[in-house]
Amino acid sequence: MPKISTESVNTTIAPSQPASTAPKDTATLFNPAKPTATPAQSSIDSVQPYHHKANHNQNRSIAQSGDATSSATASSSVTAAPKIGFVSLGCPKALVDSERIITELSRDGYQVASDYDGADLVVVNTCGFIESAVQESLDAIGEAISKNGKVIVTGCLGKEADKIREMHPAVLAVTGAHAYDEVIRAVALHVPKPDRSLDASYDPKIDLINEAGIKLTPSHYAYLKISEGCNHRCTFCIIPSLRGDLVSRPIDSVMNEALALKKAGVKELLIISQDTSAYGLDLKYKTSFWNGMPLKSKFYDLCQALNDLGIWVRLHYVYPYPHVDKVVELMGEKKLLPYLDIPFQHASHRILKAMKRPAHSENTLARIHAWREICPDIVIRSTFVVGFPGETEEDFQCLLDWLVEARLDRVGAFTYSEVEGAVANDLPNHVPEDVKQERYERLMTLQQDISAQKLQEKIGKTLMVLVDEIDREEGVAICRSYADAPEIDGHVYVDDIDAHVKVGQFLTVTIDDASEYDLFASYQA
């Protein structure tokens, strides 16, 4: 097996560059190697970066967006259709927004360009979550203007239209997040829709775009957004000001899309929102009919219905509320992937109170232990903020002690940074940057050891894995188990695969070895 290339391993704090979204037979993430040091040695002596990421960035360049949509639009009957370039930045929720806009544009007859030169106009879907994301978005707008000249801006940073226009006065239009219709109208204003009535061969009823729409992810997994906005007012976060309060989709709408995705060949659904466990609260858990059955727009009911589809269902952005216990019972019954992405953010009650985190008074350790009693195989991923204003060494040590007892499977961390408009900016006793970084390193070193220990326990066991990529030259499949969300968690590297193994296929493998974050397995056809 080839030597590991630590230079290309994604780190936790550096912005990540996404791999190509299309299924491929050439590995692009990094070349794996079975570890030559013990886990205890490697966490101390090696310089391998921390692999689990805090953010869920799903950035797509103009080339990646064009490549991902080419199969759906390449056979367009209007050969001279105008081409729209698309740059998508930010989280999976923003990626879903981009997918919807691209789908609607394609249905209107536009094609998606793969480069700036070939685009009649470029749409940039921005992120405004943290200052580094704001700067990245402003840079992307500038690049699009420089290389194309006709640019429409949408997404979370669109809330700051004055800032965008001050820096980039040449932009044609600015809209906010999930403003689909506004974007479509702005595109049509500056690049008129093709007149498909002039093409006698065009029949919208047999349009190549299926009910699931165009996806910017590989064909075997997709993000399913169940709600928009958030009712919480965490002091470090400005998402409610960018995306509004909680607005849930009716459950029949969610299930129709989920079924369409399954029919399109999707093997794994990643459920996303700002607060997945609050799903349906704004609808007062309204009952709808789907597939001839009454269903409540409620978190538990949705999980039950999704399970019945018979594909992998992975839950992201869940809060540790008591009603999540019932969903863990479904996992214990093997009816959902036993995986929870829960942003705990901290463990010190004093800091959680300053953050105004929901459920901060809950005994989260007791809840985690109870979940493991119900479902011993459950995997818990979380993110944490270190160096929040007012965080003392005692507060930080509380977090480290909590991690030792919690033994989470996947952890990412941010060092706190000010975000324009966040309440936390005005809190006293900001932590010096060097102290933030030192605490970040201590947290991630501790968690690296925990991760290594937990993965060592997998050696000798069998796991079902989903193939994401294949390196035919090395004979290695880059896969994920139920414990691994795409692009943010670890991988399972499977040796000596044969020509019959395909991307998007499930394999049952035996775990032979482990490193701090990844597993290494063998497969017998």
UniProtKB/Swiss-Prot annotation:
Its cofactor is [4Fe-4S] cluster. It comes from the Bacteria. Residues 456-525 form the TRAM domain. It comes from Psychrobacter arcticus (strain DSM 17307 / VKM B-2377 / 273-4). InterPro entries: Elp3/MiaA/NifB-like_rSAM, Methylthiotransferase, Methylthiotransferase_CS, Methylthiotransferase_N, Methylthiotransferase_N_sf, NA-bd_OB-fold, Ribosomal_uS12_MeSTrfase_RimO, rSAM. Belongs to the methylthiotransferase family. RimO subfamily. It is found in: Cytoplasm. Residues 216-453 form the Radical SAM core domain. Its EC number is 2.8.4.4. GO terms for cellular component: cytosol. This is Ribosomal protein uS12 methylthiotransferase RimO. Residues 82-192 form the MTTase N-terminal domain. Binds 2 [4Fe-4S] clusters. One cluster is coordinated with 3 cysteines and an exchangeable S-adenosyl-L-methionine. Residues 1-44 are annotated as: Disordered. Keywords: 4Fe-4S, Cytoplasm, Iron, Iron-sulfur, Metal-binding, S-adenosyl-L-methionine, Transferase. [4Fe-4S] cluster 2 binds at residues 230, 234, 237.
